[in-house]
């Protein structure tokens, strides 16, 4: 049974490899994997999308065992930096979509509750990212100011 106020809804998903070792079928060197990651990022893919593409199209289950570095660390080393962490950005986009829906359908109470849940997650993540230093201490979640991220 799914956990309440989470978006999994009991769906089955793929499982990460149990032992993060380099599989025997991988033909790529660590340098080639790094180049693939950087190339995909420059083409506009988010880190999670890069991982999916590497898994599905190149047969690379995990980047870290091969390169010894996390995918986002590789991107930082090559000067590719994201304004906001990806999970926070996706939640903000979801909240903005719900707000747009509520402008057209103001009596949709289920969506209003959904917006409350999403914004609660946003506030928890903002607190966490401020604490670990990924967001500046003066960052404030403001839907109107962040509306440019809805694209």
UniProtKB/Swiss-Prot annotation:
One Pfam family this sequence matches: Ribosomal_S13_N
Keyword Ribosomal protein included in the entry's annotation: yes
Skewed-composition ranges (Basic residues): 1-16
Top-rank taxon: Archaea
Region (Disordered): 1-20
Family: Belongs to the universal ribosomal protein uS15 family.
CDD domains: Ribosomal_S15p_S13e
GO molecular function list: small ribosomal subunit rRNA binding; structural constituent of ribosome
GO biological process, one term: translation
Oligomer and partners: Part of the 30S ribosomal subunit.
The entry's keywords: Ribonucleoprotein, Ribosomal protein
Gene Ontology cellular component terms for the protein in this record: cytosolic small ribosomal subunit
Record SMART domains: Ribosomal_S13_N, Ribosomal_S15
Species the sequence originates in: Pyrobaculum aerophilum (strain ATCC 51768 / DSM 7523 / JCM 9630 / CIP 104966 / NBRC 100827 / IM2)
Record's protein name: Small ribosomal subunit protein uS15
